[in-house]
């Protein structure tokens, strides 16, 4: 059974907010060696890339994620910044971070938003 989950079909996501000139890319990956399908445990990692395409700096202040497994159970992740940081992203620069998301089903999805402000 485990071999069926070695290379699941995974979709990357990119969104561009034309009004604020911020582009967000999310690149998920299935981590087979940390997963245990026989125990309904599927481990996914993801990389987030935030590109500031505006003319000035922005600061990431909050994140709001909804993680939904294949059984439609949802978890909510809300908090200040990401990975303990509230990064200031200069004009033309990017910020990247990695995190993970274990699921109890082989499929699922994530959606959410980031809140930014112009640093003082």
Task: Go through the PLM ranges and name each one.
Residues 1-43, 55-59, 68-120:
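Membrane engagement elements in two modes
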Residues 50-54:
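Asparagine-centered strand-capping/turn motif at beta-strand->loop junctions
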Residues 63-65:
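Hydrophobic beta-strand segments
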